[in-house]
Curated annotation (Swiss-Prot):
Transmembrane domains' residue ranges: none
Species in which this protein is naturally found: Haemophilus influenzae (strain ATCC 51907 / DSM 11121 / KW20 / Rd)
Domain of life per record: Bacteria
UniProt KW keywords: Cytoplasm, DNA replication inhibitor, DNA-binding
Lipid metabolism keyword on record: no
Segments of this protein annotated with the region Interaction with DNA: 100-101, 129-133, 163-169
Family: Belongs to the SeqA family.
Annotated compartments: Cytoplasm
Name this polypeptide is given: Negative modulator of initiation of replication
A Pfam family that the UniProt record links to this protein: SeqA_N
GO molecular function annotations of the record: DNA binding
Function: Negative regulator of replication initiation, which contributes to regulation of DNA replication and ensures that replication initiation occurs exactly once per chromosome per cell cycle. Binds to pairs of hemimethylated GATC sequences in the oriC region, thus preventing assembly of replication proteins and re-initiation at newly replicated origins. Repression is relieved when the region becomes fully methylated.
Principal subcellular localisation of the protein: cytoplasm
BP term (GO), one: negative regulation of DNA-templated DNA replication initiation
Length: 197
């Protein structure tokens, strides 16, 4: 992997083209430039690398992964979360808040406070290819670099990175909300606060 420097405008454009959590700059540029994605399949795991064809083949160690079964939420629990999130979205304080990071933290706080177990499962599954988005301590997030700007989600034991653009914040929220089995209509309502007009 090579490192290149780009100006802020180009960086923001590339970041705005992100389609999924964990998508790297290389993945985004390959997609934008219509270049093929290099993949190889090992034991039903897909390994993606821009350097696959450039290096001699190496043995790849694949460790066994224990798949956790996630506990489905009851309709009552889902409805309770939906109600709490909608109450937050409709509050004057939230409506008047201009900072995306404050809105982001407020929504995460409500998700956690309404169903901590479901929130914990959701955040465990949300990680980028090279980055951890949520942790129970600041140090874990700082291991990826001081530039991650970790902040504690108010009234929770969780920390989250905040040096992301609004689009990435929404992808993180969307991933958590989908994992918590919340309806797409609610996710779309939240999305309206994180899209640039």
């Amino acid at each position: 992997m090579k490192i290149i420097e780009v100006d802020e405008e180009l960086y923001q454009y590339i970041a705005s083209q992100t389609r999924s959590i964990g998508e790297s700059a290389s993945d985004i540029l390959r997609r934008l430039l219509s270049l093929p994605v290099h993949t190889s399949i090992v034991n039903d795991l897909i390994i993606t690398s821009a350097e696959t064809d450039q290096k001699p083949k190496q043995a790849i160690n694949v460790k066994e992964v224990n798949i956790k079964t996630t506990k489905k939420q009851s309709i009552t629990a889902i409805n309770q979360i939906v109600e709490k999130v909608q109450t937050l979205l409709n509050s004057t304080e939230f409506q008047e808040e201009s900072k995306a990071v404050v809105r982001f933290l407020a929504i995460l706080r409500v998700l956690y406070r309404t169903n901590p177990e479901s929130f914990a499962q959701a955040t465990e599954s949300l990680q980028g290819r090279t980055r951890v988005y949520f942790a129970r301590d600041e140090a874990t997030l700082l291991m990826a670099g001081n530039h991650t700007k970790p902040k504690q989600i108010p009234d929770t034991p969780y920390w989250v990175i905040t040096n992301t653009n609004s689009g990435r914040k929404m992808l993180m929220l969307e991933g958590a909300m989908q994992s918590m089995e919340l309806p797409e209509t609610l996710i779309d309502e939240v999305r309206s606060y994180f899209t640039v007009n």
